[in-house]
Amino acid sequence: FKIKANQKTFVTGDTLHLTIQNRKNTAYDSIQFFLRGERIAVPYIVPEDALLGDIPTEAAVFIEGKEIRATSHLRLLNKTAPSLYTYTLVNEFPHDKQAYTQGLEFDGEHLYESTGLKGKSSLRRVNYKTGAIEKQIDLDATYFGEGLTLINGKIIQLTWQENTGFIYDLESMAMERSFTYDQSKEGWGLCNDGTVLYKSDGTSKIWTLEAATQKETSYIEVTTHKTILTKINELEWVKGTLYANTYQGQKDVVVIINPKNGAVDGIIDFAGLRNKVEQIQGLDVLNGIAYHPERKTFFITGKNWSKLFEVTLQKK
């Protein structure tokens, strides 16, 4: 048995017709269809609040009391194209060009930064105006540092492929404990909305985690009107919306994501910024976005960038 749908891709509001391809013409008693594990009646109108992305689809075929399962995926895309944004440069500040930036977040006037590469990974508190490192905690050389976020007086820092995150006291930066990942296999970006954590793992998924236990509870898939985006990296939460660094099509871009369903509502093209930094060996992509609530500006840097840029955003 094989699941057949009336279209390859759908958007919310579409009517979904599911049938079973039964090549052997096997007699069966009944069929039940499921999307994301929940039984549906067909035809099925895709609700407006549906999660976007690749939807696990199942059919349960009943034959004389026995159940046979067929599995597939349906792709649910965003209804509208993302808005395009550009930036205005407000300020340039010095940034450590040896910092392979993986995470960036403000606490008042203090900028916290996580850096990567084995043997060079660290957690830092930085004076963003001077670039001076006020305090630095180096990770053991077995770890490759990734994203970070600040919540409830703690710093939470990810590592890449070591299946481990670290929790520090915000003020002293003393490490308190570690935790292991759940279903996500890697650590990339991290942010929070004041209640829960959001974690990217290099795929199309952004996971929601309980802040206290770091347990993964659900995920969204980052989806445009045409495709599903992967390599979602450093994250920032701003006024109910997720901002994510991602390197797409040879461009340094940040995507603006609806945290409820994964829809890409905007794309910010940061073309030109990388040309303004010292062109050293090892210079890498834009990765690092931090919002300053008082200044209402974004701070942008990259891996081994010699500058930290303060910008405002405008729709094109």
Where are these regions (language model features)?
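A short beta-strand motif characteristic of beta-propeller blades
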Residues: 88-94, 132-139, 174-180, 217-227, ...
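Beta-rich, blade/repeat-based domains predominating
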Residues: 97-108, 141-152, 182-194, 227-240, ...
